[in-house]
Amino acid sequence: KSAAXVTLDLFGDWRAKRHDNAQLLTGINLNGQTLGIAFMSKXSVGLIQDYXKSYLLVASVMAHELGHNLGMEHDDGNCICPAKCIDNKPLRTDIVSPAVCGNYFVELTPGSQCADGVCCDQCRKAGVTVAPDLCFDYNQLGTEDKFTHSPDDPDYGMVDLGTKCADGKVCNSNRQCVDVNTAY
């Protein structure tokens, strides 16, 4: 058994009769690419590596593992996103939620940014340009995360593809600041 599987077993034994669900955050490296592991049937426990500077990335892994604890599996090629798929966008009539914008979904095009409000994710002030070394490919979670380094700079968190990084330039999939006409 791997160190992650042994730790998960021991944690599951500890909490077996004490809680409905438990998630253990650890600073220990979980076997290279493993950022989290959870049982889908045995005991409702998860083990999550606190691996990043951003609590949002760690929270995302924890939510993923909690989904496994609740019996959810990964979507596969056969899933065409009916209601049972995790990637399915819920209809406004199917959920209870606060007020939303537009057609109820955030659908920003590459390079789009919002300023604030309930439709904003990773909010930035309008017209803000990030430093070229902050380009970050959201699809590369778990690799070298780039964040602002100076305490004088605002914290932009992750900077996704298409974010303006200089005049006429945007972040591309190689985390480089390139001419907007050659980025895609």
Swiss-Prot record:
Residues binding Ca(2+) 2: V100, N103, F105, E107
Positions of Ca(2+) 1 binding: D20, N88
Keyword entries, A-Z: Calcium, Disulfide bond, Fibrinogenolytic toxin, Glycoprotein, Hemorrhagic toxin, Hemostasis impairing toxin, Hydrolase, Metal-binding, Metalloprotease, Protease, Secreted, Toxin, Zinc
Co-factor binding comment: Binds 1 zinc ion per subunit.
Limits of the Disintegrin domain: 98-124
Record GO biological process: proteolysis
Pfam families: Reprolysin
Regulation: Inhibited by EDTA, DTT and zinc ions. Partially inhibited by L-cysteine. Not inhibited by 2-propanol or PMSF. Activity is enhanced by calcium or magnesium ions.
InterPro entries from the UniProt entry: ADAM_Cys-rich, MetalloPept_cat_dom_sf, Peptidase_M12B
Major subcellular site: secreted
GO MF entries: metal ion binding; metalloendopeptidase activity; toxin activity
UniProt record similarity statement: Belongs to the venom metalloproteinase (M12B) family. P-III subfamily. P-IIIc sub-subfamily.
Protein name as annotated: Zinc metalloproteinase-disintegrin-like ammodytagin
Naturally occurring in which organism (per UniProt): Vipera ammodytes ammodytes (Western sand viper)
Species lineage: Eukaryota, Metazoa, Chordata, Craniata, Vertebrata
